[in-house]
Amino acid sequence: MASHTRFLTVPLTAQLRTARRMRRPKSHNAKSGQGHILDMVSIRERPAEIEDRAVPGHWEGDLLTGANDTHIATLVERNTRFTMLVKISRKDTTTVVAALAKQIGKLPEELRRSLTWDQGKEMHAHKRFTVATNVQVYFCDPRSPWQRGSNENTNGLLRQYLPRGADFSRISQSYLNAIAMRLNQRPRKTLGFETPADKLQAVLH
């Protein structure tokens, strides 16, 4: 059990919240840098167990962009709304896929089933990610962020912690872990006012 929950236990830092808003990533506008992705599997081909959120282990992901072309990946589990944040040093597909594979690889097998992403160029090497993690990637329709509703909602919550125009290169992974812990310890109406952390613990028991 300890090995399953080690990624939940990170130190919590203080003074994280701010009322300012986060800059929207470039991937959400018409000049997103999206392009044709080889061997892309459409979100429309996702099985029913993903659509109805019945089975844990299916994730939604996105790349947030800050000042000076800095980036953070957000990962939200659809069943529990559990959130992970990953600092990304560069936006090229090799760097992004490697960072995501490393983070997903920390999870127990039952939490590694699928990932839904938009059609940004950073996921061109999605097959490499799948080989490394055994996690299938599904791609949203162009400019359709609502198809990753849990992820979009979480990105909105993150605006309370990360100021608009922040240079993410100045933010440590430990700081991101603390923000994620705050989100995961917040009761959610959609979860019957349980927390994502509690829901995930129940899955792992």
Where are the regions that the model predicts?
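Two-metal-ion RNase H-like nuclease active-site motif
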Residues: 56-65
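Short conserved beta-strand segments at catalytic cores or DNA/RNA-binding microdomains
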Residues: 51, 64-84
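Acidic/histidine-rich, metal-coordinating catalytic segments
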Residues: 110-123
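Basic, flexible linker segments flanking DNA-binding modules
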Residues: 1-51
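Mobile genetic element proteins and their domesticated derivatives, centered on retroelements
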Residues: 62, 75, 81, 100, ...
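Active-site beta-loop-alpha junctions of metal-dependent nucleic acid enzymes
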Residues: 65-69, 85-109
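Charged alpha-helix within mobile-element recombinases
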Residues: 120, 130-137, 141-205
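Glycine-centered loop/turn motifs
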Residues: 49, 57, 165-166
